[in-house]
Amino acid sequence: MTILLAEDEPDVQLIARLSLKKAGFTVVTAGNGVEALERVAAERPDVILLDWMMPDMDGFETCRRLKADPATAGIPVIFLTARVQEAEVARAMALGAAGCIGKPFDALTLGQRVLEFVAG
């Protein structure tokens, strides 16, 4: 299973990437929403793990565009964020997200959390 990890913080991206690879995922990375859209078009990942706050295009706008495009609307989007307030989680879910994982996350169980959201 291929995951696109869109995260602008290099340390967080590294920890998440290594954790997901250790769990058996193939990981493609992007540093912002614009780059994430480009990578999705080129790579067609099975799941997208998306930070909310990124430069150039935030996660909300990235998710909105992904869900508006019939070619990518079916790819599960999971937000990875330090901001897990109820209103923001509700906004993410209204955009079509499969779920939200809070930061800091447990690197040992990140892959399992992703699978839980994808399985529904």
PLM features: residue spans?
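Conserved acidic carboxylate
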Residues: E7
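Charged docking surfaces used in two-component/phosphorelay signaling
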Residues: L14-K22
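Acidic, metal-coordinating helix/loop segments flanking the phosphotransfer/catalytic sites
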Residues: T29-V47
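Active-site residues of response regulator receiver
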Residues: D51, T81
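Receiver (REC) domain active-site loop signature in two-component systems and cognate sites
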Residues: M54
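Short, glycine/charged-rich "phosphate-handling" switch motifs in NTP-dependent
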Residues: A98
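C-terminal output helix
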Residues: F105-V114
